[in-house]
Amino acid sequence: MNVFLSKYVNGVDKKSRVSVPANYRAVLGKELFNGVIAYPSIRNNCIEVCGISHIEKLRQMIETLDPYSEERDAFETMIFGEAVQLSFDGEGRIILPQSLMKHAGIEEQACFVGKGVIFEIWQPQNFEKYLNAAQKIAHEKRLTLRNAH
């Protein structure tokens, strides 16, 4: 399967290492880089994580914007300027930079949330709050999926 699915909570050790779920690593196994690209989410207080191929798609989308626009500059700065390449160690762990941990409020535990082409890393209690709000929105907007093609 080529999508990130499910939710997992893993511990973060004193060296800021956290194990990426095995099925997420399997999806990323098709990438040229043995690791992930992580950057602060521009939507939520979490970390967005993907492979090199998705970063390339984001680059292509951003390049369609006017090169001198405020929006393009903001997206380039927040996604590419803040992104870090994180390699897997022999045990499938990555080291989360302090700046990303602070952005997401992560300390001792990290909640991995599959979002299809990307996954997010949350502070577990913050994700539970978000999940409650997302459930309400999904329920209210459920009919919009019927028209999606």
From Swiss-Prot:
* Record note on quaternary structure: Forms oligomers.
Q: What is this protein called?
A: Transcriptional regulator MraZ
Question: SUPFAM superfamilies, per this entry?
Answer: AbrB/MazE/MraZ-like (SSF89447)
Domain SpoVT-AbrB per the UniProt entry, residue ranges: 7-54, 83-126
Question: Which PANTHER family does the record match to this protein?
Answer: TRANSCRIPTIONAL REGULATOR MRAZ (PTHR34701:SF1)
Question: Biological process (GO) annotations?
Answer: negative regulation of DNA-templated transcription initiation
Its subcellular locations are: Cytoplasm, Nucleoid
Recall the GO molecular function terms of this protein's record. DNA-binding transcription factor activity; transcription cis-regulatory region binding
> Keywords in UniProt for this one?
Cytoplasm, DNA-binding, Repeat, Transcription, Transcription regulation
InterPro entries noted in UniProt: MraZ, MraZ_C, MraZ_dom, MraZ_N, MraZ_sf, SpoVT-AbrB_dom, SpoVT-AbrB_sf
Keyword presence, Cytoplasm: yes
Question: What does the similarity note say?
Answer: Belongs to the MraZ family.
Ranges that cross the membrane: none
| GO CC annotations on file | cytoplasm; nucleoid
Keyword Oxidoreductase in record: no
Mind telling me which HAMAP family this protein's record contains?
A: MraZ (MF_01008)
Q: What does the record give as the organism's lineage?
A: Bacteria, Pseudomonadati, Pseudomonadota, Alphaproteobacteria, Rickettsiales
